[in-house]
Amino acid sequence: MRVNLLIAMIIFALIWPATALRAAVSKTTWADAPAREFVFVENNSDDNFFVTPGGALDPRLTGANRWTGLKYNGSGTIYQQSLGYIDNGYNTGLYTNWKFDMWLENSPVSSPLTGLRCINWYAGCNMTTSLILPQTTDASGFYGATVTSGGAKWMHGMLSDAFYQYLQQMPVGSSFTMTINACQTSVNYDASSGARCKDQASGNWYVRNVTHTKAANLRLINTHSLAEVFINSDGVPTLGEGNADCRTQTIGSRSGLSCKMVNYTLQTNGLSNTSIHIFPAIANSSLASAVGAYDMQFSLNGSSWKPVSNTAYYYTFNEMKSADSIYVFFSSNFFKQMVNLGISDINTKDLFNFRFQNTTSPESGWYEFSTSNTLIIKPRDFSISIISDEYTQTPSREGYVGSGESALDFGYIVTTSGKTAADEVLIKVTGPAQVIGGRSYCVFSSDDGKAKVPFPATLSFITRNGATKTYDAGCDDSWRDMTDALWLTTPWTDISGEVGQMDKTTVKFSIPMDNAISLRTVDDNGWFGEVSASGEIHVQATWRNIN
């Protein structure tokens, strides 16, 4: 017994020092971070999200889930330079060629992170994604991201879409707490085979609890409202068809047009913030240089106005709390400079956007969003337009196929403007199509593309003699003549005394749902489920012998 005991004690003495000296990562558990507030932007106009600090920046929860028109691409002013990310508040730097893991405990959502966030224009980062891909991800985080050489990298994890969707559904005033684990090591382990930084022989592992409170939700509403504006050579605007909230207005010595361009709702928990700024910016640099600051102005109430001049004038988050709209004023000189620069037939979504700047977060505090409403700006001399009679950019219909089912009908308003009536007006329908038995049909497809179903389609309008003219128009991209439509004429007189006229008519695009050919696919198979299609209607006008 004594011998056995002695042997056991000797073995223990030999093994214990080896265990005590085994190398491991250095684990540091930081004190809980102070709770931070964030503002969430739900952009229904552009179908993306943005999150930004309501107060202090660190710990970080900041940035958009999609690039906007402000994305930096290697030249010009640096605005948006990464997508959204989180950190533990210490903004810890990473070592070149080391590997990095980040994972969350008590994560509010499964698969919260996509990889290592970096600044897109820094050396070693991806200009397109601002992301360094890891070897693998799981429900808690990502693992095995190699820190590239070049510009600085930090312990930042890029947020997944699932994380943004969680933030979207959080009630204002609610909070979540998660434990952020961040680990880097020089050991070249294989994360795709299950190895992890925390299990390596050396490295640094940091653990910290962070809490974020949703202090506000800004919802940008896409109203799909649409209006036409015709401008003469002196920039004087004339409102055409549409339902956007526009009116002629004079501000000081400038006359022009003002329109409600953004609709929003803003819910808060009482947050006070002045670092968040919102203002419009002209996308066309030549136009921005040609107009004066007061030729484009913006307002939260339509009565008190601020000029547009880069970042000099803005409304703060606190000011936005007392409103639900943003109005924009365009002076006649604004439109005149458009004419001088040859900018015509343009959609306001392509002309300017609104910018969102949070001065607290310079790297990820820039964001851009489109207007809720759309203006179609056209020259009054020799122009043609077509808009939905619902005054929306993307009219849609749905229905059922079978005997007695109603057609899908779309109504449009066609407008021409010139010194005289147009000599010729043509119209055509484009979209997925296939010829069957010598006739062109619009083709609707299932989401998986396996079912392709033919539908006939027609264009019809009332002629001058009161008859209905109908064309077979199966999305075939062929022009049809509608010059003999019944046009309603309104004369106009230019500021120079020159006269002209604006002519309007209506046209209907119809897709029957009760045609027997639509009961089978283009391959002559039966089908069941849902199919869809999208297309466009184009018009063109010609004036001849105009002096």
Swiss-Prot record:
Signal peptide: 1-20
Protein induction: Negatively regulated by H-NS. Positively regulated by IHF and EcpR.
Primary location: other
Family: Belongs to the EcpD/MatE family.
Keywords of the record: Fimbrium, Signal
Record GO cellular component, one term: pilus
UniProt subcellular location: Fimbrium
Function: Part of the ecpRABCDE operon, which encodes the E.coli common pilus (ECP). ECP is found in both commensal and pathogenic strains and plays a dual role in early-stage biofilm development and host cell recognition. Tip pilus adhesin, which is required for assembly of EcpA into fibers.
Keyword Signal: yes
Gene coding for it: ecpD
Protein name (database record): Fimbria adhesin EcpD
Quaternary state and interactors: Forms polymers. Interacts with EcpA.
Lineage: Bacteria, Pseudomonadati, Pseudomonadota, Gammaproteobacteria, Enterobacterales
